[in-house]
Amino acid sequence: MKTIEIGNKAEEQASKFLRTKNLQILAQNFKAFPYGEIDIIALDQNTLVFIEVKYRSKTKFAKAEEMLTYSKQQKLINAANIFLQENPKFENYECRFDLIAINKEDINWIKNAFILN
């Protein structure tokens, strides 16, 4: 299976998981040039959640949780700002950055994976 197919499968698995937790999926693979994309954008009651999905099939060297770098966090923040500019109806919502880490078949949902400085 190609890397992009694996990533898409992991993101779909994460979306299904989030729906079981009563989150409303607003967007998947939101493109925010030049910062890349946000894997999933969802509503958790009145909180707008920007979610990065990381998948690792092997955890011998590193777990998925360890793959969210500072650089990636900055790109997510910038991409979230673009989403908010394009969708002003969400400008007064609380915002949160979460991580869905999938290690093999285990899903770990880390709310507030990082905060704005």
UniProtKB/Swiss-Prot annotation:
SUPFAM superfamilies: Restriction endonuclease-like
Any single Pfam family the record assigns to this protein: UPF0102
InterPro entries in the record: Restrct_endonuc-II-like, tRNA_endonuc-like_dom_sf, UPF0102_YraN-like
One MF term in the entry's GO annotations: nucleic acid binding
Recorded family membership: Belongs to the UPF0102 family.
Protein name: UPF0102 protein Fphi_0415
Organism: Francisella philomiragia subsp. philomiragia (strain ATCC 25017 / CCUG 19701 / FSC 153 / O#319-036)
